[in-house]
Amino acid sequence: MSALLRLLRTGAPAAACLRLGTSAGTGSRRAMALYHTEERGQPCSQNYRLFFKNVTGHYISPFHDIPLKVNSKEENGIPMKKARNDEYENLFNMIVEIPRWTNAKMEIATKEPMNPIKQYVKDGKLRYVANIFPYKGYIWNYGTLPQTWEDPHEKDKSTNCFGDNDPIDVCEIGSKILSCGEVIHVKILGILALIDEGETDWKLIAINANDPEASKFHDIDDVKKFKPGYLEATLNWFRLYKVPDGKPENQFAFNGEFKNKAFALEVIKSTHQCWKALLMKKCNGGAINCTNVQISDSPFRCTQEEARSLVESVSSSPNKESNEEEQVWHFLGK
């Protein structure tokens, strides 16, 4: 545990508002050959947006147009590194929203056309997650699986709570610090059922399929074996992270037990079905923006020219009023 605490205390410089880049190792080079990002506005400002393009340079929605699962057709013959044949069927695309050790709460803008990544704004202010001793920012590379949706009108059969109206979240536990906007391939290991203000907010535990240690990880027990203390720290982080903002501790289904890979895959399957209903206009999506360019039978599909017009309507001018959160440590005693 002492080794884990030393690791968690090692954070990025306070001035690093947002880590951006196009590559962070073998897996990222492969993924970024398929997807690219384009910034508009200035990081750490309310007008900042990070849009996505496919390999041909056309704008896409990361929420809707990036496939949930990795497959040979999508990869165009690019070989996987160290992936076992029986695991290849369970490789998923993950969109990285928040690099490990950073505080800016970046998220896919589900209610905006083309769903760029932006920084979450609450009460007119940019949202930053607090540093709770001994942690620094997010303690994993944090992001989401595309083509998933936790339906706010449907009770989860496991938690008996409605969904949180977002794609399913992922905590990537690999050895590399990734970049906002990267699309990587991950192996699913398990899942945690967070109940956030009465809503189901699943947290997948996964590892980059091209991480140097990925071959050792196949299920949730491998996390306990090879990264002792990490799951306990994850549970504690999610329990406390809203307390500095004056909110109560979060609760969990299953008494905070991490469920295994098989359970996690069923949850992913369910959220993917909810997303399909959303894109086919078979359920109430509310304010969710379903504009896409690649889902052929979706009534929300638009042309490449229309997608370009939507992106170009967003201001690309730098905002001089960028703001970085003051870095303080919160000590929460019991």
UniProtKB/Swiss-Prot annotation:
Phosphoserine modified-residue sites: 317
Tissue: Detected in brain, gastric carcinoma, lung, ovary, skeletal muscle, umbilical cord blood and a cell line derived from kidney proximal tubule epithelium.
Modified residues (N6-acetyllysine): 224, 261
Enzyme class label: hydrolase
Chief localisation class: mitochondrion
GO BP, sorted A to Z: diphosphate metabolic process; phosphate-containing compound metabolic process; regulation of mitochondrial membrane potential
Cofactor(s) the record lists: Mg(2+)
Effect of residue 167 to L: In SCFI; decreased inorganic diphosphatase activity
Binding site for Mg(2+) 1: 164, 169, 201
Record keywords: Acetylation, Disease variant, Hydrolase, Magnesium, Metal-binding, Mitochondrion, Phosphoprotein, Transit peptide
UniProt-listed Enzyme Commission number(s): 3.6.1.1
Keyword Lipid biosynthesis included in the entry's annotation: no
Catalytic reaction annotation: diphosphate + H2O = 2 phosphate + H(+)
Family as reported in the entry's similarity comment: Belongs to the PPase family.
Subunit structure: Homodimer.
Full protein name: Inorganic pyrophosphatase 2, mitochondrial
Organism: Homo sapiens
Encoding gene (name): PPA2
